[in-house]
Amino acid sequence: MDFMIQAVTDIGNVKETNQDSMSVKRLCTSQGTMVFAVLCDGMGGLSKGEVASAAVVKAFEQWMWQKLPELANTSIEEFALKLQWEEVLRSHNRDIQEYSRRIGCSMGTTAVVMLLTQNRYYIMNVGDSRAYELQSNLCCLTQDQTLVAEEVREGILTEEQAKNDPRRSVLLQCVGASDNIFPVMYSGEVKQDA
């Protein structure tokens, strides 16, 4: 399977600093070509979101070089991958909180991490950074962890109401600004021509 990779970030219309960080790598393994990607969006309402997002991306790059080769020598086990990614996110949640306290400012970031193998995808997210599949249409593979998205899932708000709700960017959790985080794992089959 061939992988076409493109990655772009944009500062947007509100922020003075681009607080996005990302890394995308194509890897040759004994199991075939894989793609590992991580995208973090520093929280604009907090100072130094770019520091938090860069720290989490760097941590996942280290995981990729140190741990992924071992996992890739055999078939990827989702549970082992989930535990390792949760540990990266939770340890950096603590590290970012400690650093924030030391320097006296708040910082946080959302995160979405993805591993594509020849036939499966594995995704984990915290916050509202998303992963999509593009085939004949665009399909979101993750769920936002925001107050408004949660209210839509619970039937409190409709999709239409959510689009204009002033609370739509209120996160339920993020790395660095939440005491506890509960990353969500998604997996599925990689579709041909997607």
Predicted regions span which residues?
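PP2C/PPM-type serine/threonine phosphatase catalytic domain
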Residues: 1-194
